[in-house]
Amino acid sequence: ADMAVNAALKALDNAGINSEDIDLIIAATSTPDYLFPNCSSIIQKNTGAINAVCFDISAACSGFIMALSAAKAYIEAGMYKKVLIVCSEKMSGITDWKDRSTCILFGDGAGACVVESSEQEGVKSVDLHNEGMLGEVLTAKRNENIVMNGQEVFKFAVKKVPETINTLLKKENTDAEDIKYFILHQANVRIIESVAKRLGIDMNRFPVNLSRYGNTSSASIPILLDELNRENKLQNEDLLVFAGFGAGLNWGSIILHQIP
């Protein structure tokens, strides 16, 4: 949980928010240090977020999408005002280093963000899906390593991700040209390139950082979002699309409006 705590502290600092003002912590991880206490409780203990309710989400590579969707729902319901989302994965701990079909793909990492209520709508439409019948395509049993049918995961991703993005754009009555960046889960470059091609959108609007970190599962989208922010590539009023996909099999997308 060290990476999770570090990411959480940096997110709070960047947002200029006191940890005691956080009233909900959602941790997304498939590689917790403990069965219990959960990762979010460890984050609470080490950040001083003493007023927060804590729970974890296990949604593998779609973890950030699911966590952000949950935060949106809780805030809109009036239950919580400031939510800390932390995605942290130690993929090296469940990787078979003799299996080159997986060991060269994954990396360790953590990313975090603070979501709070606002008069303006930041997190807009959400589109989520799950197909448990395909669960055996990507598995990691207790105390065992990742087993993946890469070909089936590829076929699933390049079909379902464009579908969910198109559904999202229709919900918002928004054209793809209005989107600044499509920030996808960083699974592999071939998947991202194929999604861009199927959508008919230039690849330069699909940022990629795989060469630096590999596939960090739920952490990949918040890590990439932080990089774009640090590089001053995000501006107020930008529209962004996040899309995640992975073990479950599950997938989904969210449209975000960058507000001042």
Model-derived regions, located:
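Short acidic, glycine/serine/threonine-rich loops at helix termini
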Residues: 36-38, 95-98, 251-255
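Short coil/turn connectors at secondary-structure junctions
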Residues: 19-23, 49-53, 77-83, 99-101, ...
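Conserved active-site "lid/cap" helical segment
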Residues: 1-23, 141-180, 191-200, 224, ...
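Short beta-strand segments
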Residues: 28, 58, 83-89, 115-116, ...
